């Protein structure tokens, strides 16, 4: 039997036995059904970035109360939340309205993910639709039996106290239903790219969220040097609570014997790892690189991570050669769970107070 009748990943013209053909058919039907739901304006923007990335093996769903924004999205499915509640005019930055809209559309949400094995929910917490709908979507995903992972941002301190308070309330609701909530504080992104205009900073935020989802999903949807299956992923991410993500890359200029360490150091020292990493007791690691990446380098990265977190941690990892990766580059995605999380409300208050003090000092200098 030729490839085109069995599996598009087998080179054309290659034949397989009847037994292998049966196995390949079973593999195709047993692939985990993975969905990404972008909730609200920010979540849909992140989902749009994922569409550009062409994440393998996932279906993209855009869910929003703003019909004008929704119609511009490229997705496998679009859900206009709360047709009666908002009439397609948005939630007005009110999470209560966003929640009501999602509940009105709960049957459509349920039907869209009824066969899911894993559901990612992306949104920017703090606004109306994403904040209000994320936990409703998560509840439906859990009811369907899916491993439910939320990847969310917390607002910039400059967006104000009310938006932060909305975000924290939304986060608490989301944690009740999602297995894992990966939290990315936008203010931490500023420490990576401090001089970017706000609009560009939001795009960086989309890139980080999309990259996190891609890195996790493709651990099970793409073959690699070291493969993981869906059961491995569930072991680490089921009922994991809040988690953080670190991303690191060694440039092509790095020396071959140092690039693995540079990549893991960058990931483990990422400002996005906003926790005491020594207390983390679960880790998910995805290592990708060019065709000159070795298995030994991947193992070195895993070894370095294990040295820096709880010694009794449960670690799973995968490694894959990316055809489009820059030669001599290595990229590491690390998801850490089980660590003690900071009090975001106190941290944000301190940030605001610090900026206010800086402004007062500037005024004193002007005077």
Residue ranges and their predicted role:
Residues 2-367:
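Tubulin/FtsZ superfamily GTPase core signature
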């Amino acid at each position: 039997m030729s490839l085109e009748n069995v599996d598009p990943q087998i080179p054309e013209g290659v034949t397989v036995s009847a037994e292998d053909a049966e196995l390949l058919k079973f593999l195709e039907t047993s692939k985990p059904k993975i969905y990404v739901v972008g909730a609200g304006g920010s979540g849909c923007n992140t989902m749009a970035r994922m569409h550009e990335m062409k994440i393998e093996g996932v279906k993209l769903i855009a869910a929003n109360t703003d019909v004008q924004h929704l119609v511009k999205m490229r997705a496998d499915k679009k859900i206009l939340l709360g047709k009666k509640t908002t009439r397609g005019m948005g939630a007005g930055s009110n999470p209560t309205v966003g929640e009501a809209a999602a509940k009105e559309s709960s049957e459509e949400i349920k039907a869209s993910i009824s066969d899911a094995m894993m559901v990612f929910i992306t949104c920017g917490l703090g606004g109306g639709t994403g904040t209000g709908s994320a936990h409703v979507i998560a509840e439906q995903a859990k009811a369907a039996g899916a491993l439910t992972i939320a990847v969310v941002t917390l607002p910039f301190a400059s967006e104000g106290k009310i938006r932060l308070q909305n975000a924290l309330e939304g986060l608490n609701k989301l944690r009740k239903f999602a297995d894992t909530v990966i939290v990315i504080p936008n203010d931490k992104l500023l420490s990576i790219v401090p001089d970017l205009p706000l609009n560009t900073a939001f795009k960086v935020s989309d890139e980080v969220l999309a990259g996190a989802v891609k890195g996790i999903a493709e651990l099970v949807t793409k073959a690699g040097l070291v493969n993981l299956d869906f059961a491995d992923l569930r072991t680490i991410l089921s009922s994991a609570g809040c988690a953080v993500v670190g991303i690191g890359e060694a440039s092509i200029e790095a020396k071959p014997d140092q690039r693995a360490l540079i990549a893991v150091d960058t990931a483990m020292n990422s400002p996005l790892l906003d926790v005491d990493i020594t207390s983390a007791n679960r880790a998910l690691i995805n290592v990708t690189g060019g065709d000159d990446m070795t298995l030994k380098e991947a193992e070195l990265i895993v070894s370095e991570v294990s040295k820096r977190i709880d010694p009794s941690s449960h670690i799973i990892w995968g490694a894959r050669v990316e055809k489009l990766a820059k030669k001599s580059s290595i990229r590491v995605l690390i998801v850490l769970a089980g660590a003690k999380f900071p009090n975001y409300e106190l941290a944000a208050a301190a940030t605001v107070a610090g900026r206010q003090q800086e402004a007062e000092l500037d005024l004193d200098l002007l005077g």
